[in-house]
């Protein structure tokens, strides 16, 4: 049985291969997850790690969930999400479809990554439980792409009825404005993990939601 969607976390700490392979990552993740608690989620996002390594790392983070109630969401890898029993999976345009995931994992919460109001509508109609919409501001991972800022979030929120999580270059000082425009919450990667005190950085995001 799926968790009630009103319990969807509002601050999403997104990882990467590079972040998860840093020395002391699990210790830092524990601190971040403790701060966020059930208002937060850690996204386990990997393109390079082999399956056994990703599986072991996900299980380690899931143990931290038991202590902190911070959600664990696996990006793309439905097999890892199912094998570990995480709280959700985040699908991209390269992933299998939302209906396909529902057919094999009916209890799994499903997020969809979108880049337009139209994609958000399609994701909701397909049965996704939320969308991560971006990018809002220019980021090092998407150099040269035009920043969409708050008008983009307005358009996405107006197009759907499920929760919208904004992503892309979002700093703590942006959060309140984005939430006031109807977003359920925000996702951040470098803004949390590249800070010397990731625990404090996460708390800054949470305090603005």
Task: Give the role of each language-model region.
Residues 18, 137-139:
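A short, flexible beta-alpha/helix-coil linker loop
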Residues 140-144:
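Short, glycine/charged-rich beta-strand-loop motifs at protein surfaces that mediate ligand recognition
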Residues 1-129, 145-148, 155, 161-162, ...:
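Conserved N-terminal beta1-alpha1 strand-loop-helix module at the mouth
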Residues 181:
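C-terminal binding/interaction regions
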Residues 167, 189:
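Short hydrophobic "strand-cap" motifs at the C-terminus of beta-strands
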Residues 184:
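Short, glycine/charged-rich "phosphate-handling" switch motifs in NTP-dependent
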């Amino acid at each position: 049985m799926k968790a009630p969607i009103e319990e969807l976390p509002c601050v999403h700490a997104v990882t990467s291969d590079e972040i998860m392979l840093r020395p002391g990552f699990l210790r830092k993740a524990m601190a971040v997850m403790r701060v966020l608690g059930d208002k937060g989620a850690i996204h386990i996002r990997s393109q390079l790690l082999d399956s056994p390594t990703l599986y072991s790392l996900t299980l380690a983070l899931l143990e931290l969930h038991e202590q902190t109630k911070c959600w664990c969401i696996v990006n793309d890898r439905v097999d890892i999400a199912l094998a570990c029993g995480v709280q959700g999976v985040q699908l991209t345009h390269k992933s299998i479809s939302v209906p396909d995931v529902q057919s094999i994992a009916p209890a799994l919460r499903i997020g969809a990554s979108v880049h337009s109001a139209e994609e958000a509508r399609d994701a909701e109609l397909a049965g996704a439980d939320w969308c991560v919409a971006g990018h809002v501001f220019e980021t090092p991972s998407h150099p040269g792409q035009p920043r969409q800022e708050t008008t983009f979030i307005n358009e996405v929120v107006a197009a759907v009825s499920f929760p919208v999580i904004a992503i892309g270059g979002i700093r703590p000082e942006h959060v309140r404005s984005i939430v006031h425009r109807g977003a359920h919450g925000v996702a951040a990667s470098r803004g949390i993990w590249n800070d010397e005190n990731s625990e404090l950085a996460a708390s800054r995001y949470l305090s603005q939601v």
